[in-house]
């Protein structure tokens, strides 16, 4: 993910960033204007990294100011530069630290590998009844035919419900299937386990869920990869994970390095399912992998976004507010947002058309009768109101 950072006052830049930019340019002529521009560009890149972006969009002139510190990424080959430079400038005008550029290249190669990989197809004819929602059905179809699957959706759209049925179908197709389920944090892994166990108890899955599947463990991603205190995974490209299916919940929390380590360890003929909502939990470190992957056109067949939320009623104000916040332009000021919210959500829901029952107009008229109405006029209204209940009176009389 790239970003554009406007120049900031030096008072707003952390001291360590200032010091590092000066250290990187210590061999430059301190009197030359390009030296200051180079330092400013480095500072902007560091600020962008702090915000979770892996690169910064800059002009060719800004990149040129970095002189011997930067090299141009090869636009026609996937090969890495012959020599290692601190910074990489690619054909999309994005400036990287070499480390994050190299991680993105590795991850991209694994995505291409999985996209092109032929996987054993699963016949879903006998499982058509398991899911009714067309998007959930599409998710099952995708996993049955693709090695890489991205299942996204907001709260209450049935991600875990759908996953339970997907896993049950895969388990029925291959009773000896080896499944790994993990999440970036221990808390997320525990929630995943509890939610799946509840879903596996559905009577509709009774014939598909085995005792082994009911006892399926969930791990943290670090434990799955065998990462110790030195953050070096025990499983990698030369020693891949021993699983046929790998499921990662809360995948929005995957940063660039962790995602690359994960995909390094995905073996051939393995299905990997990323489950999450990019609008919710974000990664702590650099890179928002799930959000970036779901916007790649070439992966359209590898992604299903669940649409229908069952957490609140259709048209509920809380749902409208959530969608409004997600669509809000991040550049809008707080005061503008409040005014816009009042216009779009609050005022729009104050006046609602009310459909009255047949007898309600008479009730309303009685409530708003003038105080000086005569007894005769009031009696006429009462008789008119009673007509609506004549059938009930007759039945009681009988």
Protein language model features and the residues they cover:
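Conserved lysine of the Walker
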Residues: 159
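Inter-Walker segment of RecA-like/P-loop motor cores
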Residues: 183-242
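Conserved helicase motor core of P-loop NTPases
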Residues: 279, 283-398
């Amino acid at each position: 993910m790239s970003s554009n950072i406007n120049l900031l006052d030096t008072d707003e830049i952390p001291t360590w960033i200032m010091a590092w930019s000066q250290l990187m340019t210590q061999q430059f002529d301190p009197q030359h204007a390009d030296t200051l521009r180079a330092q400013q560009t480095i500072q902007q890149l560091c600020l962008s990294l702090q915000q979770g972006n892996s690169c910064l969009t800059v002009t060719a002139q800004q990149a040129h100011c970095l002189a011997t510190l930067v090299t141009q990424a090869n636009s026609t080959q996937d090969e890495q530069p012959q020599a290692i430079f601190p910074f990489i400038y690619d054909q999309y005008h994005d400036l990287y630290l070499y480390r994050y550029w190299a991680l993105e290249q590795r991850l991209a190669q694994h995505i291409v590998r999985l996209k092109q990989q032929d996987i054993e197809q699963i016949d879903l004819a006998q499982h058509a009844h398991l899911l009714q929602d067309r998007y959930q059905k599409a998710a099952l179809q995708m996993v049955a035919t693709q090695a890489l699957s991205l299942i996204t959706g907001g709260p209450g759209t049935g991600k875990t419900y759908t996953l339970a049925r997907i896993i049950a179908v895969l388990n029925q197709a291959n009773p000896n299937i080896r499944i790994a389920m993990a999440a970036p944090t221990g808390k997320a892994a525990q929630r995943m386990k509890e939610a799946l166990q509840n879903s596996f108890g559905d009577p509709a899955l009774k014939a598909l869920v085995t005792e082994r599947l009911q006892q399926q463990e969930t791990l943290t991603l670090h434990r799955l990869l065998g990462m110790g205190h030195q953050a070096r995974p025990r499983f990698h490209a030369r020693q891949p994970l021993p699983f046929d299916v790998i499921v990662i919940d809360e995948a929005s929390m995957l940063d660039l390095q962790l995602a690359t380590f994960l995909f390094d360890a995905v073996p051939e003929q393995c299905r990997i399912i990323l489950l999450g909502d990019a609008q919710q939990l974000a990664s702590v470190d650099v890179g928002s992998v799930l959000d970036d992957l779901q916007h790649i056109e070439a992966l359209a067949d590898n992604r299903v976004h669940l649409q229908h939320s069952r957490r609140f009623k259709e048209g509920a104000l809380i749902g409208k507010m959530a969608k409004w916040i997600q669509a809000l332009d991040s550049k809008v000021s707080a005061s503008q947002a409040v005014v816009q919210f009042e216009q779009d959500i609050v005022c729009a829901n104050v006046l609602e058309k009310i459909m009255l029952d047949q007898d309600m107009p008479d009730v309303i008229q009685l409530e708003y009768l003038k105080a000086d109405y005569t007894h005769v006029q009031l009696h006429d209204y009462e008789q008119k109101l009673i007509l609506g209940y004549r059938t009930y009176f007759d039945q009681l009389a009988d």
